[in-house]
Amino acid sequence: MSFVLLSKMAKLKFNHIRHTIISTQKSTTIMPGISQLLNNRLIGKEFSSAVPTMFKREDYKLTIHDIAFSKWRNLIRHNDWKDFNNRKERVRRYRHEDLPPQRCTGLYELGVGVIGQDQGQNFDPDNNVLGVYVGQCVDVKSRLQDYGRRGGHLPSGLYEDIFSEGYSVFYRWAPEAAATEGMLLSTFDYAWNTCSNGERRHLELQKLGDPEFMSKRKSQVLVPSIRDQVVTIKVEKSNYTFLTSTLKVMRPFG
């Protein structure tokens, strides 16, 4: 369905809602925010001016974009840097064998997770890795190598904290996905991102060691382009509340 047709349908929906509100105005109390929302839309103001709801990325195992990404792969084990600095035999600072096979432009997510000694091949990244950072670059392989060697541009304290807890660093990537980064950053608050989400929240990643939190992580797929808002109108004479409509509010990508 084209964007033009969707816009026309949305306008008809709002006109119908506004007509309903006007016809019951004498006996109705309307939420000021919703009334202004409707008026703004009808006179051409965009919803994007409103402050969007942000979801903590680590709370969600799945997103609408998962199909575009590779599987989660281990980049740095929690003891790799320590063992390398101690000159332990056959140890490297990062898992170079798990990097993308070619150099290309793309999008990547970093995650943290626990690989227990008893898990071995049964380790399930989807259930045990928390997404903490998203970025894009012209050469994903080189960027990941930089993270593996020296932590990249991220503060060293982030790595020290998670390694001390026994957590490892993971990544997944998708080629040619610059637009997707904007959608993810406009939807999710990543614990290690600051460009759109404010201060880093690395201390909150201690929840990775909380079995109750890990078992309750949300698995539903979030669609960044659509938000649901319920308009409630209270009719005072009848002393009851009814729902007039559920508005599908479209958020622009990026």
UniProtKB/Swiss-Prot annotation:
PANTHER family in alphabetical order: PROTEIN EFFECTOR OF TRANSCRIPTION 2-RELATED
Keyword field contains Cytoplasm: yes
Location in or out of the cell: Cytoplasm
Residue span, GIY-YIG domain: 103-152
Transmembrane segments: none
Main localization of the protein described in the UniProt heading: cytoplasm
Swiss-Prot/TrEMBL domain comment: Contains a bacterial GIY-YIG-like domain.
GO molecular function, one term: DNA binding
Pfam families: GIY_YIG_domain
Sorted UniProt keywords: Cytoplasm
Cited InterPro entries: Effector_transcript
Protein name in UniProt: Protein EFFECTOR OF TRANSCRIPTION 3
UniProt keyword annotation of Transcription regulation present: no
GO biological process, one term: regulation of DNA-templated transcription
GO cellular component: cytoplasm
